[in-house]
């Protein structure tokens, strides 16, 4: 894959629950803490090394941001780091929350 692909939240949801891809959330720490997709890895500059060490380059990666814009740059960056397949989630966490409101986890006991 030379270029990342965009997928919708339904496709991302299916891939994640089938174990066919990992989901990373690149939003700021406060937004992530207020609500995120269970099982999503919070990918930041500080956690990038851990993510790359713990995840195979062959495992597809789905990148989620706020609305599906910032994730595109992060997806391209991950491709450049050597990941075989990277996807940007259209609509980001906003779309995920609208489609799957029961599947939102809060870090602060919410």
Curated annotation (Swiss-Prot):
Q: Which UniProt keywords apply?
A: Cytoplasm, Transferase
Q: What is the lineage of its organism?
A: Bacteria, Pseudomonadati, Pseudomonadota, Gammaproteobacteria, Enterobacterales
Q: What is its main location?
A: cytoplasm
Gene name, please? glpE
The UniProt entry's sequence similarity note says: Belongs to the GlpE family.
The chemistry this enzyme catalyses reads: thiosulfate + hydrogen cyanide = thiocyanate + sulfite + 2 H(+); thiosulfate + [thioredoxin]-dithiol = [thioredoxin]-disulfide + hydrogen sulfide + sulfite + 2 H(+)
Write out the catalytic residues in the record: 65 (cysteine persulfide intermediate)
Q: What name has this protein been given in UniProt?
A: Thiosulfate sulfurtransferase GlpE
Cystine links in this protein are none
Q: What does this protein do?
A: Transferase that catalyzes the transfer of sulfur from thiosulfate to thiophilic acceptors such as cyanide or dithiols. May function in a CysM-independent thiosulfate assimilation pathway by catalyzing the conversion of thiosulfate to sulfite, which can then be used for L-cysteine biosynthesis.
Q: Does the keyword section mention Endoplasmic reticulum?
A: no
Statement: the UniProt record of this protein carries the keyword Nucleus? no
Q: Which GO terms describe its cellular component?
A: cytoplasm
Q: Where in the cell is it found?
A: Cytoplasm
HAMAP family, sorted: Thiosulf_sulfurtr
Q: Which SMART domains match?
A: RHOD
Name the Enzyme Commission number(s) assigned to this protein. 2.8.1.1
A Gene Ontology BP annotation from the UniProt entry:
glycerol metabolic process
